[in-house]
Regions:
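Generic C-terminus detector
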Residues: 195-207
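Carbohydrate-binding surfaces of carbohydrate-active enzymes
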Residues: 1-175, 181-191, 197
Length: 207
């Protein structure tokens, strides 16, 4: 069905995405690349614009202040460029940050990652975008691993992992799932259900 929650109240992939894109304070990215300019595989060569344009929307009644961090990375998550923007968004408003051009970098082997932090340094939102269709991106094996520690599932990655899926049982609800990782470690809270066994996979495994 098209529902994001099944008959028993269990979360499907869409519901985890909905939790993110309906966040009261949201960071999102409008990327320019192949899919926004020309999807014809037989097209004559042309100058492809590759850019990222971050937006922060604030649907709360309070002013939001924080920092938007960004990085341009390779498939192994190593950094090519990085930086940040100070962000102030009035209540019930949205702010566009400066557009960034990456036309001089590779189309199939670079990706753009972004993260929004509040004044206390807490992660409010994050994500990543590609400049080509995912099936054409040169993903590297992120060497994902996951294990249970107390009330958390700890996920580790050695490279870029897109749409990381934690499988921990049909009745388990987590604080996050189907997320992107720039390598490193991420702790995901077990909100409901009992975890007997845990496995993890990403877009890399769709082959």
């Amino acid at each position: 069905s098209w529902a994001s929650i099944d008959y028993f109240g269990r979360w499907k992939a869409l519901h985890y995405y909905e939790k993110r894109f309906f966040a009261p304070v949201l960071i999102s990215c409008h990327e320019e690349g192949i899919l926004s300019q020309n999807t014809n595989v037989n097209a004559e060569p042309f100058g492809l614009k590759k850019s990222a344009h971050l937006n922060v929307s604030n649907e709360t009644m309070q002013k939001f202040r924080g920092k938007a961090k960004w990085s341009l990375r390779r498939p192994d998550a190593s950094v090519i460029e990085e930086g940040s923007f100070d962000v102030t968004v009035p209540a019930l408003s949205a702010v566009w940050l400066p557009e960034q051009d990456f036309s001089n970098y590779g189309t199939y082997d670079t990706y753009y990652s972004y993260q929004l932090l509040d004044e206390a340094g807490n992660v409010v939102g994050e994500g990543s975008v590609l400049f080509c269709a995912p099936k054409h991106f040169r993903f590297a094996d992120p060497e994902l691993n996951a294990f249970v520690k107390d009330d958390d599932i700890i996920v580790t990655a050695k490279g870029y992992a897109r749409s990381v899926e934690i499988q921990a049982g049909a009745d388990v609800v987590l604080s996050d799932n189907y997320f992107d990782m720039d390598g490193g470690v991420k702790a995901v809270k077990i909100l409901r259900g009992s975890v007997d066994n845990v496995s993890v996979r990403s877009v890399w495994d769709i082959r």
